[in-house]
């Protein structure tokens, strides 16, 4: 899940991601959050994780904004950007957003 603390649509989507995570974490669903915050945004990024209740363990950011290495690898040019990755490690769905739970159920 690519996001940033300054991204209002990302922050608005976070409660839904948290809800789906809490519902399916015991069935093999996990979230890997990649923040596109800037170098001077580390404190805001960490605060947003707490404020939004992003309780999963996987949070990373190189604090390089749009020059983020993971964003380049995944071709991310806008956020929020979510990838559902299947059990074989292949990208199954890109940006399911409101359809997240339904798409996830197809993979579990």
Where are these regions (language model features)?
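Flexible loop/turn segments at secondary-structure boundaries
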Residues: 6-9, 38-42, 67-69, 91-92, ...
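Short beta-strand segments
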Residues: 1, 31-35, 60
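Small/polar loops that bind or transfer phosphate-bearing groups
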Residues: 2, 62, 96
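A short, structure-level motif marking secondary-structure boundaries and short turns
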Residues: 5-6, 31, 52, 96
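Short, internal strand/loop/helix patches
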Residues: 46-83, 87
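Structural microenvironment flanking redox-active thiols in thiol-disulfide oxidoreductases
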Residues: 12-52, 65-71
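Short active-site neighborhood of thiol/selenol oxidoreductases, capturing the structured segment around
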Residues: 1-11, 17
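Thiol-/selenol-based redox modules, centered on thioredoxin-like
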Residues: 78-108
């Amino acid at each position: 899940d690519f996001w940033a603390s300054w991204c209002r649509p990302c922050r608005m989507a976070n409660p839904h991601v948290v809800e789906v995570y809490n519902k399916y974490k015991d069935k093999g669903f996990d979230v890997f959050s990649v923040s596109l915050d800037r170098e001077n945004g580390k404190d805001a990024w960490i605060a947003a994780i707490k404020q939004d209740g992003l309780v999963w363990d996987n949070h990373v950011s190189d604090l390089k904004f749009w020059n983020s290495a993971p964003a380049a690898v995944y071709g991310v040019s806008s956020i929020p950007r979510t990838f559902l990755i299947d059990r074989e490690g292949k990208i199954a769905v890109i940006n399911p957003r409101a359809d997240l739970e339904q798409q996830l159920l197809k993979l579990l």
